[in-house]
């Protein structure tokens, strides 16, 4: 995530290489419509080439971009700070908001439930969140979510499942089977 004030298109590959020791092939970026920032990311060169020649004007979107827009909108209506966590297979996305203001965003790889607990509690502490009033919103595999929620309740007062936005239900029941980032992209 690069602040819009310092982002320059010609330097995005350098920024990606600085942030990641081995960035993926093609360097791309997405302007975040709700934040004064640009999301810089890498895409496998073969995937990029295949999509570019097989699709008409493909649009490449980082999976976190639509989630950030969704969470910003949700957090504006909430007084306490929100820590949003989406659990994927071996990766988790984490973002912290205070009344619509993005405080933190990152993705972490994990192998065990303990890794998830560590990252959540570490980000919670670093963001200066209050254990008694701020909220953790979790989305992902239900058994894994239940397992970590039981432990997190020893440390945090408000832990809720992250619900699929109500607008998604208007698109039909099949949409509910899609990953959250695809649902957020369609809203």
Residue spans of the language-model regions?
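Hydrophobic/aromatic-enriched cytosolic interaction surfaces used to assemble or bind macromolecules
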Residues: 1-187
């Amino acid at each position: 995530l690069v602040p819009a004030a310092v982002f320059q298109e010609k330097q995005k590959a350098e920024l990606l290489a600085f942030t990641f020791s081995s960035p993926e092939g093609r360097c791309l970026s997405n302007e975040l419509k709700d934040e004064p920032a640009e999301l810089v990311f890498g895409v496998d060169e073969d995937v990029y080439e295949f999509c570019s020649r097989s699709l008409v004007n493909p649009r490449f979107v980082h999976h976190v971009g639509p989630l950030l827009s969704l969470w910003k909108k949700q957090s504006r209506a909430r007084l306490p700070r929100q820590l949003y966590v989406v659990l994927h297979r071996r990766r988790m996305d984490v973002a912290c908001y205070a009344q619509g203001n993005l405080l933190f965003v990152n993705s972490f790889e994990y192998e065990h439930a303990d890794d998830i607990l560590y990252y959540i509690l570490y980000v919670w502490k670093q963001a200066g969140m209050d254990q008694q009033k701020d909220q953790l919103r979790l989305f992902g595999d239900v058994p894994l979510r239940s397992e970590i929620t039981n432990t997190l309740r020893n440390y945090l007062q408000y832990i809720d499942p992250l619900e699929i936005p109500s607008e998604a239900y208007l698109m039909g029941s099949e949409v509910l089977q899609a990953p959250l980032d695809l649902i957020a992209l369609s809203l």
